[in-house]
């Protein structure tokens, strides 16, 4: 049986990350730094000798482009890829497009902190992390995990909060634990899964 390898990568820096804006389902492109981060992720994964069988990404440009740059850097452009809205970033609703400092000025530091860092309180018109988990986790269980358990080396390029939903499940973290987890842009996390889908090994790849 082949190793059951799952790699998670948060997209490279986007134009709105750089401008300190709430992004959510809005669709900014990568910055030059974001492109470099994605290529560096590809180089790190290539150095590991990984050959991907399948890949998954969201419906948003920054994640799709990150995936394409990673696979291009690895010389694996032909990997079958599935795009799905289930892997989209958390929807920030009325906060989307706002500068985070401006949002704090409008609603107050405490309220914005609650929206950003509580598990189950959503901003106006948006999703909480719990809502994001409810959207993302079934897709992981039904579509992504079966590929990994079949021995297909699997790459997921997505977003900070949709990946938090997967990491929470993989690492059996509490809501409080996952809210504290910071994911760097363009930094691959490599999981080796046991036959029962638990994590046998985890490594963070850094340049």
Swiss-Prot record:
Active-site residues, record numbering mapped to chain: 11, 89
Q: Does the keyword Isomerase apply?
A: yes
What the entry lists under Gene3D superfamilies is as follows:
Phosphoglycerate mutase-like
Site (Transition state stabilizer): which residue positions? Answer: 159
GO MF annotation, one: phosphoglycerate mutase activity
Entry's Gene Ontology BP terms: gluconeogenesis; glycolytic process
Keyword terms? Gluconeogenesis, Glycolysis, Isomerase
EC identifiers of the protein: 5.4.2.11
The residues that hold substrate are 10-17, 23-24, 62, 89-92, 100, 116-117, 160-161
Catalytic activity as recorded in UniProt: (2R)-2-phosphoglycerate = (2R)-3-phosphoglycerate
Keyword Cell cycle applies = no
Pathway recorded for this protein:
Carbohydrate degradation; glycolysis; pyruvate from D-glyceraldehyde 3-phosphate: step 3/5
Name the InterPro entries on file.
His_Pase_superF_clade-1, His_PPase_superfam, PG/BPGM_mutase_AS, Phosphogly_mut1
Q: What functional role does this protein have?
A: Catalyzes the interconversion of 2-phosphoglycerate and 3-phosphoglycerate.
Fill in the subunit field for this protein: Homodimer.
Quote the PANTHER family the UniProt record gives: PHOSPHOGLYCERATE MUTASE
Q: Which family does it belong to?
A: Belongs to the phosphoglycerate mutase family. BPG-dependent PGAM subfamily.
State the HAMAP family in the record: PGAM_GpmA
**Protein name, as recorded:** 2,3-bisphosphoglycerate-dependent phosphoglycerate mutase
| Organism name | Xanthobacter autotrophicus (strain ATCC BAA-1158 / Py2)
